[in-house]
Every structure is written in structure tokens, then in C-alpha cells.
């Protein structure tokens, strides 16, 4: 059986929006580009036609990928817990004990992860270390370079 793809509601909506855009805007544009390139004549040495075919293949592959991800998506429900434990979907504020730097992240599935936006994968070393933990707990993160400790300050 294929692996589930863990997504928040926002993540599913983003994928659906991208899919709709590809189906309703990009795909028709690519088809028009193909028609225009085909009308230029000899297809054997037609760079525009080759480029349009390549673009069509890329778009169709992305459409298929999005459809597969959406069909295999496992929705993360409301992240609030009665016991305060961190789970996928939780927003967590922590302090790195070695640098005293404070960070705030949201734990999401791997497909949605974007560290620059503070969205970390549930498969990341930090998420693996803090999942199931609570405010006030300190944990060691087993990083590739060197392990470090963090203290959980806030969970939303």
C-alpha cells in the first residue's frame, strides 16, 4: 500500500489551488503553444514545438503528482490537545540551549515543509525530538553535524 501523505488543511488547499491553476490556465496555454508551433511547419527541426512538448510533459507530470498527493493525503485535524503534548500540526516555540536563540516552528508533513516559513517536516530531527513532549521539557536533537539541546517554551 502506498504511503500516506500528511497534510494540514492549508496544505491540501494549496495543492488543490495549484492543481486547479494547472488544469484551467497552464494546460490550455501549453496546448495553444503546441498548436502555434505545429502551424510553423516542419516538426523535425522545430525548436518551438520541441519546447512546447517538453513543457506539456512537465505540466502533465505535475498534474499527475498533485492528483496522487491529494488522493493519498491524510488530513491533520486541529492540533489542540488536552494534555499539551506536541503533535503534527502544533506550533512550537523553543530555545536552543547552546546559543540561547529562540525559534518558532509549526510541525507539518514532509510535502508542506518549508523551513524558511517556519514549517518543519515531522521527519526532521527537531520534530522527531519534540513530538509528544510538553512545555518545560528539554530534549536533545540528534543533528547530522552535532547534537544540541532545546527547551520547549510554548505549544499552540
UniProtKB/Swiss-Prot annotation:
<keyword id="KW-0238">DNA-binding</keyword>
<dbReference type="InterPro" id="IPR023459">
    <property type="entry name" value="Tscrpt_elong_fac_GreA/B_fam"/>
</dbReference>
<dbReference type="GO" id="GO:0003677">
    <property type="term" value="F:DNA binding"/>
</dbReference>
<dbReference type="Pfam" id="PF01272">
    <property type="entry name" value="GreA_GreB"/>
</dbReference>
<feature type="coiled-coil region">
    <location>
        <begin position="2"/>
        <end position="78"/>
    </location>
</feature>
<dbReference type="InterPro" id="IPR001437">
    <property type="entry name" value="Tscrpt_elong_fac_GreA/B_C"/>
</dbReference>
<dbReference type="InterPro" id="IPR006359">
    <property type="entry name" value="Tscrpt_elong_fac_GreA"/>
</dbReference>
<dbReference type="GO" id="GO:0032784">
    <property type="term" value="P:regulation of DNA-templated transcription elongation"/>
</dbReference>
<dbReference type="InterPro" id="IPR036953">
    <property type="entry name" value="GreA/GreB_C_sf"/>
</dbReference>
<comment type="similarity">
    <text>Belongs to the GreA/GreB family.</text>
</comment>
<comment type="function">
    <text>Necessary for efficient RNA polymerase transcription elongation past template-encoded arresting sites. The arresting sites in DNA have the property of trapping a certain fraction of elongating RNA polymerases that pass through, resulting in locked ternary complexes. Cleavage of the nascent transcript by cleavage factors such as GreA or GreB allows the resumption of elongation from the new 3'terminus. GreA releases sequences of 2 to 3 nucleotides.</text>
</comment>
<protein>
    <recommendedName>
        <fullName>Transcription elongation factor GreA</fullName>
    </recommendedName>
</protein>
<keyword id="KW-0804">Transcription</keyword>
<dbReference type="Pfam" id="PF03449">
    <property type="entry name" value="GreA_GreB_N"/>
</dbReference>
<dbReference type="InterPro" id="IPR036805">
    <property type="entry name" value="Tscrpt_elong_fac_GreA/B_N_sf"/>
</dbReference>
<dbReference type="InterPro" id="IPR018151">
    <property type="entry name" value="TF_GreA/GreB_CS"/>
</dbReference>
<dbReference type="GO" id="GO:0006354">
    <property type="term" value="P:DNA-templated transcription elongation"/>
</dbReference>
<dbReference type="InterPro" id="IPR022691">
    <property type="entry name" value="Tscrpt_elong_fac_GreA/B_N"/>
</dbReference>
<dbReference type="GO" id="GO:0070063">
    <property type="term" value="F:RNA polymerase binding"/>
</dbReference>
<keyword id="KW-0805">Transcription regulation</keyword>
<dbReference type="InterPro" id="IPR028624">
    <property type="entry name" value="Tscrpt_elong_fac_GreA/B"/>
</dbReference>
<keyword id="KW-0175">Coiled coil</keyword>
Amino acid at each position: 500500500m502506498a504511503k500516506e501523505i500528511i497534510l494540514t488543511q492549508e496544505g491540501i488547499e494549496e495543492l488543490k489551488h495549484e492543481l486547479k491553476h494547472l488544469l484551467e490556465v497552464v494546460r490550455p496555454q501549453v496546448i495553444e503553444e503546441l498548436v502555434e508551433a505545429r502551424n510553423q511547419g516542419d516538426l523535425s527541426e522545430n525548436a518551438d514545438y520541441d519546447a512546447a512538448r517538453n513543457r506539456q510533459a512537465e505540466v502533465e507530470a505535475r498534474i499527475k503528482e498533485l492528483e496522487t498527493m491529494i488522493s493519498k493525503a491524510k488530513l491533520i485535524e486541529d492540533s489542540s490537545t488536552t494534555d499539551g503534548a506536541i503533535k503534527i500540526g502544533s506550533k512550537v516555540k523553543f530555545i536552543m540551549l547552546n546559543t540561547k536563540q529562540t525559534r518558532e516552528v509549526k510541525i507539518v508533513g514532509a510535502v508542506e515543509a518549508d523551513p524558511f516559513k517556519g514549517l518543519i517536516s515531522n521527519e526532521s530531527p527537531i520534530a522527531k525530538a519534540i513530538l509528544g513532549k510538553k512545555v518545560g521539557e528539554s530534549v536533545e536533537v540528534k543533528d547530522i553535524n552535532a547534537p544540541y539541546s532545546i527547551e520547549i517554551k510554548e505549544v499552540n
